[in-house]
């Protein structure tokens, strides 16, 4: 059964590496960091099925910047339920006034802002965050995240504000239409009326999709039933065939500020 699963996984996720270890299907994906701020998402579980520790998910490596404080080292900024951010920085092990003290065990580890300790933070599959790379624009580098392929049939985000960070919780691309289900969502004639999925591109812009009400043309004079309730790329009047990429994050813009966004596992589907 596991061999069948890994074969299916490899076929679906051609851009991600996989192997079979013990009873687990494990893999990895890489993301290129080429700018200061990049939206990323965790696509794996720990090998025992639990959430991945932040230290194991993003160990210090080439291209990453350590620092004395949150304003000097690379950051991982995770949005909280109230719309704020929980911020971790990559420590150089120094602390105290002017970095007068040093803790070798802290050097190259992620620390919660305001603390001088190795953070004990778990990142569940689908956790989406900003990665702030101090040298990203001048010295691009690659982050590799490895772990176990999730076996849950779906993962759901709760929407309680206008803008929520979302990301694919699986190491395979998920069809935006058919692979993502929403409740409490608003359809509209244009991108300014319907709910949005805004996926960050490599150049720092966004591919923006809106939930269509099926209408198009001047003043919504035409109607396509097959488009009603489907995601459409901004500027188009067709149900998109695009997929949500692995390892990248996106903004979900909710007009009602309530509802859910559910990603369906393409491996177990």
What are these language model-derived features?
Residues 1-21:
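Sec-dependent, cleavable N-terminal signal peptides
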Residues 4-5, 112, 199, 233:
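Residue-level detector of intrinsically disordered terminal segments
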Residues 17-72, 82, 120-193, 242-269:
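A short, polar beta-strand/turn micro-motif
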Residues 26, 35, 58, 83-87, ...:
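Intrinsically disordered, low-complexity segments enriched in small/polar residues
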Residues 68, 73, 79-81, 88-93, ...:
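Tandem-repeat architecture and repeat-register "anchor" residues
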Residues 87-147, 211-267:
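Charged, amphipathic alpha-helical scaffolding segments
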Residues 169-232:
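Intrinsically disordered, low-complexity segments enriched in Gly and acidic/Ser/Thr residues
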């Amino acid at each position: 059964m596991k061999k069948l699963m890994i074969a299916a996984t490899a076929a679906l996720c051609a851009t991600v590496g996989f192997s079979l270890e013990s009873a687990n299907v494990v893999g990895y994906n890489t993301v290129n960091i080429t700018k200061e701020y990049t939206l990323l998402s965790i696509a794996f579980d720990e090998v025992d099925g639990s959430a991945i520790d932040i230290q194991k998910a993003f160990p210090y490596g080439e291209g990453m910047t350590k620092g004395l404080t949150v304003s000097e080292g690379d950051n991982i900024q995770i949005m909280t339920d109230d719309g704020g951010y929980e911020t971790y920085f990559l420590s150089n092990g120094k602390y105290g006034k002017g970095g007068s003290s040093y803790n070798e065990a802290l050097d190259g580890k992620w620390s919660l802002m305001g603390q001088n300790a190795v953070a004990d933070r778990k990142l569940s599959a689908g956790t989406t965050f900003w990665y702030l790379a101090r040298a990203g624009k001048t010295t691009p580098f690659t982050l590799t995240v490895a772990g176990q392929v999730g076996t849950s049939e779906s993962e759901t985000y709760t929407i309680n504000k206008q803008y929520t960070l979302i990301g694919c919780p699986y190491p395979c691309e998920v069809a935006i239409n058919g692979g993502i289900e929403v409740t409490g969502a608003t359809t509209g004639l244009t991108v300014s009326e319907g709910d949005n999925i805004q996926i960050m591109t490599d150049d720092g812009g966004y591919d923006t999709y809106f939930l269509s009400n099926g209408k198009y043309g001047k003043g919504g004079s035409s109607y396509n039933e097959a488009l009603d309730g489907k995601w459409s790329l901004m500027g188009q009047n067709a149900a998109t065939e695009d997929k949500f990429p692995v390892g990248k994050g996106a903004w979900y813009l909710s007009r009602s500020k309530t509802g859910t966004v559910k990603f369906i596992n393409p491996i177990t589907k």
